[in-house]
């Protein structure tokens, strides 16, 4: 059964927030005994320097969250005899498109539950985001995880997924990301170590740029200086873009033996485009991606980078809870999760001439 929370205006919430933070901390620490009488709204108003209406709304929220309960007539408000569940609520603003996002969400949920928090998943249309954020601020949600909406204009604490901080970094900017540079560099090294030099790159500007930087540095290290000319930027993940850029790559670099893609969706579309061109690429052309959407036993002879999205989600939830509970100094501003190359045995060696 869904809980009903009192509706709050943003101005009232700004006054209530510090009151709630202190009272939650006291209740969590066991300052009040089980079933003990909780201070009256009048006492709270006097203590925190707010009016009685604000104090009453704070108590109503604590009741809705399970910290307190209303006694029988004349008993007043009493302290719940055990720690409430949930201790708080988080919101994940994300777009579920594939297994990567699903695994991330599972990890975030596990991280939240480990600390007695509940995770809500929401995917509002971008044009509705400003109003949605205001509604979240006036709800029991105490923090946000996001990876699809850019930087948010909200007073709630936020953990950003797969985003790098601004320069200079914002004091309020915290992120969790995988080591995209490591993945790009190590995957390109695997391609190069098998003798490939006629290499093309398919990428999108919306992807993490560190992946491309990793590709670049490995190619430069191998003496391939025209890496930028060999990079083809797609406008979107579509069959049309794949076929268009494959034709361009074949024209500029005929006989290329490897395609390094910035994501697994690009890799899948490239495989389809190669098939449609009638090119016998399997075990001849190296094809790599990023995301490991096929798992350890792929149906295509391709290699990819496992970003460990479950671990990312779990870490993001733990870091967000640390921010909510005033422990921001205990976590890094940018948490980095190592990646893992998978199915590199599918990268063919260049035949010796």
Locations of the language-model features?
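Extreme N-terminal segment that seeds HTH/winged-HTH DNA-binding domains in transcriptional regulators
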Residues: 1-49, 53, 57-60, 332-334
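Alpha-helical recognition/docking segments in bacterial nutrient-uptake
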Residues: 6-7, 19-25, 33, 43, ...
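Hydrophobic alpha-helical segments within soluble ligand-binding/sensing domains
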Residues: 19, 165, 171-201, 211, ...
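Short, Lys/Arg-rich nucleic-acid/phosphate-binding segment
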Residues: 37-40, 70-84
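Periplasmic-binding protein-like
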Residues: 91-93, 140-148, 200-204, 231, ...
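Short beta-strand elements in bilobed, periplasmic/extracellular small-molecule ligand-binding domains
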Residues: 112-124, 200, 216-241
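An alpha-beta-alpha
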Residues: 187-224, 329-348
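Flexible loop/turn connectors
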Residues: 247-353
């Amino acid at each position: 059964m869904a809980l009903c929370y009192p509706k709050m205006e943003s101005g009232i919430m700004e006054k209530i927030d510090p009151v709630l933070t202190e009272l939650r901390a006291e209740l969590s620490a066991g300052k009040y005994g089980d079933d003990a009488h909780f201070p009256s709204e009048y006492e709270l108003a006097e203590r925190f320097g707010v009016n009685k209406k604000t104090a009453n709304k704070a108590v109503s929220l604590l009741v809705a969250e399970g910290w307190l309960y209303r006694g029988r007539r004349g008993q007043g408000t009493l302290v719940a005899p055990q720690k409430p569940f949930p201790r708080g609520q988080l919101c994940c603003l994300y777009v579920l498109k594939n297994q990567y996002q699903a695994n991330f969400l599972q990890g975030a949920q596990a991280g939240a539950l480990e600390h007695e928090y509940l995770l809500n998943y929401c995917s509002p249309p971008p044009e509705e985001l400003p109003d949605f954020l205001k509604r979240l601020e006036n709800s029991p949600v105490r923090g946000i995880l996001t990876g699809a909406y850019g930087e948010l204009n909200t007073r709630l604490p936020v953990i950003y997924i797969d985003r790098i901080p601004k320069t200079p970094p914002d004091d309020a900017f915290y992120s969790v990301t995988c080591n995209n540079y490591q993945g790009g560099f190590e995957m390109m090294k695997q391609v190069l170590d098998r003798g490939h030099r006629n290499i093309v790159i398919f990428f999108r500007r919306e992807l993490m740029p560190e992946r491309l930087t990793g590709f670049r540095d490995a190619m430069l290290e191998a003496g391939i200086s025209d890496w930028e000319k060999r990079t083809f930027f797609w406008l979107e993940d579509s069959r049309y873009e794949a076929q268009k850029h494959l034709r361009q790559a074949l024209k500029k670099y005929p006989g290329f033996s490897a395609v390094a893609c910035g994501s697994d969706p690009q890799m899948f579309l490239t495989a389809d485009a190669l098939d449609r061109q009638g090119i016998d690429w399997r075990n001849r052309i190296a094809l790599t991606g990023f995301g490991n959407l096929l798992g350890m036993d792929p149906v295509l002879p391709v290699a990819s980078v496992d970003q460990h999205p479950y671990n990312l989600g779990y870490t993001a939830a733990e870091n967000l809870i640390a921010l909510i509970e005033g422990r921001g100094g205990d976590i890094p501003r940018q948490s980095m999760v190592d990646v893992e190359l998978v199915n590199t045995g599918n990268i063919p060696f260049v035949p010796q001439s």
